[in-house]
């Protein structure tokens, strides 16, 4: 959670509008190496995901699946190689634009302080209440949210949802951003 909070607290980087539009298209990992201390989990890793293609990464614990997503989200920087979206290095894409390109559902939901609505929107003013409700309906969590005392305005606490419902909320969060 601390790493996600640190990511959300980072100042927004600015890039020219022409670069923003370039940040659509294929996702490419080209000869990426990354490790935690002396332990490399990715060594000369290369992969291309075509725009619109859906990919599931599977593997043993510690194989690097989560690391791949953290590199793609810009939470980590590779030691070697490049990570690009539409030919633009991930580090050159603003955080907001990157979130419109990538939808990611993590294994464990990272709750932020605030209401159920804020769990879905992450405070992004471009995601309207209507968009959040549509995403919740798509994920199958809308009825459970509406059944809460204050619906989408209910303040989130740990026991408000079951583990499965938190996972559905995570899917709604990813869908609300309407990634490319």
Summary of predicted features, one role per range:
Residues 14, 21-180:
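ABC-type nucleotide-binding domain
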Residues 1-8:
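Cytosolic ends of transmembrane helices, especially the final helix of ABC transmembrane type-1 domains
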């Amino acid at each position: 959670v601390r790493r996600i909070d640190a990511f959300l607290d980072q100042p927004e980087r600015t890039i020219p509008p022409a670069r923003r539009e370039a940040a659509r298209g294929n996702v490419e990992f080209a000869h990426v190496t990354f490790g935690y201390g002396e332990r490399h989990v990715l060594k000369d890793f290369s992969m291309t995901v075509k725009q619109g293609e859906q990919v599931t990464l599977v593997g043993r614990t510690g194989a690097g699946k989560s690391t791949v997503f953290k590199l793609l989200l810009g939470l980590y920087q590779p030691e070697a190689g490049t990570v690009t979206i539409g030919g633009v290095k991930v580090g050159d894409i603003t955080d907001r634009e990157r979130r419109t390109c990538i939808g990611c559902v993590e294994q464990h939901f990272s709750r932020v302080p605030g209401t159920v609505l804020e769990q879905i929107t992450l405070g992004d003013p471009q995601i309207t209440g209507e968009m959040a409700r549509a995403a919740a309906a798509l994920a199958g969590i809308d009825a459970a949210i509406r059944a809460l005392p204050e619906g989408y305005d209910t303040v989130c606490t740990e026991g408000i949802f079951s583990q499965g419902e938190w996972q559905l909320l995570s899917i709604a969060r990813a869908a609300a951003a309407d990634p490319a």
